Amino acid sequence: MKTWQELTITVHRDAEEAVSNMLIEAGSQGVAISDSADYLGQPDRFGEIFPDVTQDDMITITGYFPESFAITEVTASLEKQVATLKSTGLETGPVSIASHELEEEDWAENWKKYYEPARITHDLTIVPSWTDYDAKPEEKVIKLDPGMAFGTGTHPTTKMSLFALEQVLRGGETVIDVGTGSGVLSIASSLLGAKEIYAYDLDDVAVRVAQENIDLNANTENIHVAAGDLLKGVTIQADVIVANILADILIHLTDDAYRLVKDEGYLIMSGIISEKWPMVRASAEKAGFFLETHMIQGEWNACVFKKTDDMSGVIGG
């Protein structure tokens, strides 16, 4: 039986996305995340959100490498990369890295044991596609099989995006999902009553995975997935545009978003570390948007901007 090498990094949850990307770039065939916390603050409709997080802030991120990889060299390289994260504003905590061998049969299923049904917002629950789940009447269930290289929908940036969608969608809207990844935000938009959803991702693998996840969920024929580079070439007028991607990419999105968002429509952005938040806010406001909601979880920020002439609901400072 083929043997794989499992490399496990224990790190602060703020560094989850960065470390996961490091593992993939180093050659990992996927990542599994063990996170004891499943939290989302319960904020007011508008304004600042500061969730009360009392659980352990350390998580375990595991990568899976072929037997042929020089795991000692990979480990040394990752140690150096993780050590640089603090200079970017991310908390890493007391980092530890360990590795051991794993049989292929165990590797293929190992990541799934960390993925359990999770109530993300008041209405939305994410459930692994292989799990039987008895939903409560008020729950809207999103079925996902993201694969090891895609998020399971429980990262703070995704949670805040889902919360924002739950707040702004009232039914009948057109939504554009930029950088759809696993497709979770598009599926949520459909469940929350959006009429048409257009999901784009530059990565062909993400486009395929998103479509597979969409097909797992009933009544999602209104979701249209395609390869695309942000909003380039898009002409659809949307009530809501949502983008959970890196801050340095978001700032290149705001002008096109303003062009495509209808009057009184919304731009939801997430994936923003705190030190990048002023830059993203300035970009959106320069494009013509007004800040309506600002959400914070740890070092991560998300926001809802509105295209409006009515200043009564916006945040002034």
UniProtKB/Swiss-Prot annotation:
The protein's name is Ribosomal protein L11 methyltransferase
Instruction: Give the record's GO CC terms.
Output: cytoplasm
GO MF, one term, reads: protein-lysine N-methyltransferase activity
Q: What is the lineage of its organism?
A: Bacteria, Bacillati, Bacillota, Bacilli, Lactobacillales
Q: Which PANTHER family match?
A: ELECTRON TRANSFER FLAVOPROTEIN BETA SUBUNIT LYSINE METHYLTRANSFERASE
> Cross-referenced InterPro entries, in alphabetical order?
Ribosomal_L11_MeTrfase_PrmA, Ribosomal_PrmA_MeTrfase, SAM-dependent_MTases_sf
Q: SUPFAM superfamilies of this UniProt entry? A: S-adenosyl-L-methionine-dependent methyltransferases
- EC numbers on record: 2.1.1.-
* Primary localisation category: cytoplasm
Q: Which family does it belong to?
A: Belongs to the methyltransferase superfamily. PrmA family.
